[in-house]
Amino acid sequence: MWRTNEDPRVGQAGNPDRGAARADRTRRAQHPGDRFGDTPTVSIPSRLRPIAHVYDAAYAGVPNWDIGRPQRAFVRSLEAGLVRSPVLDVGCGTGELSLFLARHGHEVLGIDLSPLAIRQATEKARWRRIAAQFLVWDALDLSGLRERGFTFRTVVDSAMFHIFSDAERDRFVAGLADVIPSGGLYCVLGDARRDERSAYGISPRELRQRFGRAGGWEIIFAFETIFERQWSRNPAFFVGVRRR
């Protein structure tokens, strides 16, 4: 467990501060990478630096997947009472989902491999006076978070798992078991995988099989939805997996 010293501002579910989000995007487009505070001091392993640099380059502009607000599936999960603190947001990017959940009273830690994205998320939290925390961290090293004393009753994943390779997915699932105690929930949104031979995307069938092999998990919901991007709306699945 962990706490912050700031009190989050609580607003209405489903109505994030869109004006603030638009201002964030405008400022980032005009001054990419030079208007943000210090990045948390966590060293990125040398093997991951090329990947981090790729995402830094994306976040120097405004990536297509950064729509300035949380995806609707996560808004509805909050309204349904599925989110319990503390919350881990894996692959948090510039922090819109983390900030949304924190603004509604949850303790949230957002992690991402991109130092620039984390700097932007940290600045958003400071500017909006929202008590969310952010850390440069590899989501495939969740056991390292456990070693630092972190556990989470909810892990949210807005389009990170769907880019992983088969081996990375197994490693990530193993890491989830390290940080989610019995009764905890993993909620994942990703582009729909229509062909089970494809390496990209997610499907309820694949998740049921993968978490079933790992043992100790159960799918509690799975439905079709939309993953919104700035210039498109892609078919997606939203799946909840509970730790037994």
Predicted segment positions?
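A short acidic, Gly/Pro-enriched loop at the edge of an enzyme's catalytic core
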Residues: 145-155
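A short SAM/SAH-binding and catalytic strip from SAM-dependent methyltransferases
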Residues: 153-167
